[in-house]
Structure formats: structure tokens, C-alpha cells
Amino acid sequence: MASLKIENVSKRFGSVGILSDVNLSIDDGDFLVLVGPSGCGKSTLLNIVAGLEPLSSGSISIDGRSVQNLEPKERDIAMVFQSYALYPSMSVAKNIAFPLRMRRQSAQEQAQKVRQVSELLQIGHLLERKPQQLSGGQRQRVAMGRALVRDPKIFLFDEPLSNLDAKLRVDMRTEIKRLHQRVRKTTIYVTHDQIEAMTMASHIAVMKDGVVQQFGTPSDIYDRPENTFVATFMGSPSMNLLPATVQPAGGKLNLRIDGTDALIRMPAHLARGAAALKAGQPVLFGLRPEWFLCGAALPDTHVGLRAAVDVLEPTGPDLYAALRLGPHEVMVRLPADARVCVGSDVDFGVDLSKALVFDRATGVSVQ
């Protein structure tokens, strides 16, 4: 296992900036997920760590040792790609053993390590097959086996599940997490899928336009996003952001939801950051769909509002309702058996103990 430090890493292709002053510190045995939309620079950063792409400035160190001038083979890193990258003419066993052959290990050592890895990944019965005889999930397991057999310091995964169907993605997601729990190797995993990021990571780095927007645990990222990009990118459905205006009353700050009569007291947990807000300042009131309760009887942590039901979306375990609050649409998650119907007005409560406020001009969270 190994720790990894990325300091002030930037990457340019000519006049085009791809990465800008990226700083990340990954502890020994950590599972870091780099997540963001296409073109945000996450795969470029992974390739720089692997040594496949030179950096323009900054430094990469593994266990305190600078590696940016080392060849990929000298960094003791194994990488799993989206496209599997298996040799079609070789059997599964030979594909897995290939890195060991390159290290000139004995046939006995190769056979022993291939057997151990195949048992770990539950592909022992596939060792004599060729890649074209395997399913997508089986091919991905073979690709992981080839990385595992090297026993590297760090594992890199570049969108390994993108080619799989939805059910297989869920299955493989669980397998990769289980594998990490067993081997406890430092891992960096790239994906554009925020569900993969939330379910697999011990830490997440959310990226946009080559800049790390936020680094933290999944709960930090989800419950305390530092800006509106993170708030809306992480979570499905995404966070509701209601335009509002700061309005003092009785020595306290309140939020007036624009275009409505709704007046909401400033959440108490935001008091320190809200002290810098000015009367009349435009903000965004952030609410996740599950931070609502339907009904008139509400706990003290909630404030009541009334809205019209516009659309209902049953998903089985949950019922998502698109509510119309003045000119704004609010997506709310309700129990599957909630008694609401399209066109009706409903009373619902907002959990102020979790609600967030963002500066509308900068998108930065008020905390």
C-alpha cells in the first residue's frame, strides 16, 4: 500500500488548459473517486499519475518519493481501463499472468499467483477460455486480475464499468468495493457516474473544467456541498435551488422565496456564514428532494409550505413529485404510498436543519 500526494499539478496542451493547480492527498489504503462531467480533466489526471501523460507543472509523489520523472513501469502502479485491453489470442490464465512473464517470474510462481487471483475474483473456471468467449463482466474481472497479480502499490481504474449494462454495473460496483476491502490497496477510480462515486469511495474529488471543486467524504460532498455545481452534480434527482432574497425581520434574517409569499427563517446552523449577508442580497435556497415531509403535522425542525402537484413519478420504493411553488419547480421524494394526486395542493415541510444557502452571484455555499 502507499500514500499519494498531488501538488499544484497543471496540464496544458498548447494554449488550452486542462488541469489547473490540482492538490490532492490520498492516504494509504484510501479509495479516491475522481468524478465530474466529460472533459473535466479526471482521466488526464489519472494518466498523469500513471505516467502516461507528462504534467506541465507541479509534482506527484508516492510514499514521499517524487515520481513525475519516472517511467510508468517504475511507479509500481497497475491500471484497469474501460476497454479491458485483453490480448484476444491468449487464454484468461495467460492474460492474467502476462505482467509476471514480463518480470521473468518462474512458471510455478505465475501459476500460483494466477490461481490465487482467480479464486479471489471467482473466475477460476474461466482460465482456459479466450476473451471473446467471455461476457463483459467476466472480461472486466480478468482485467482486474491482471492488475491484481502484480501486487502494485496503487490501483488506477479509468471508467471500468462504462461498457456494462445497468444491472452488471451494480454487480461489478459491489465486487470492486468488496475487492478493495480485502486487499486494502490505495485506489484511484475515475467515473462520470455520481452514484458510483457515492457508493464506492472513501473520499471523492468533484472536478469541473480542470479544477477540483470539492474534496471530502461522500457524506461531506452530499450534505455539505461547497458550491452549486457540486450541489446539483452530486445526487439524483439533483438538489433544488430556489431563488430567494435575504430579508431581515425582528432582528433576524429570513429568506423570501422569489415570486412567492413564502418567508423562511435563516437555518440556525448557517448563522455564522449568514452574518455576512446583506438585506436584499439574492441567494439560492438549497433543498435535497428527501429533505421534505408531506403533511400538515411537522416536527420543530421543519417549516411548512404549500404547493401544487404538477407531475408524479413512481419508482417502486419511492414516489417523486414535481411540485409547483409559485414560478418554481420543486422535486420532492415521498413514500411510495403517499396520497397525492396531480393538480391538487399539498402541505409539505422543509427540514431547516439540513437546508443550505448559496450566494447567487458566486455559487459559493454560505456556511
Regions flagged by a language model, labelled:
Residues 5, 25, 61, 347-349:
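ABC ATPase nucleotide-binding domain
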Residues 58-66:
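Conserved ABC transporter NBD signature motif
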Residues 223, 252-310, 329, 338-367:
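Glycine/charge-rich catalytic "coupling/switch" loops of P-loop NTPases
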Residues 50:
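Helix-to-loop junction immediately C-terminal to a conserved catalytic motif
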Residues 35-37:
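The feature captures the beta-strand-to-loop junction immediately N-terminal to the Walker
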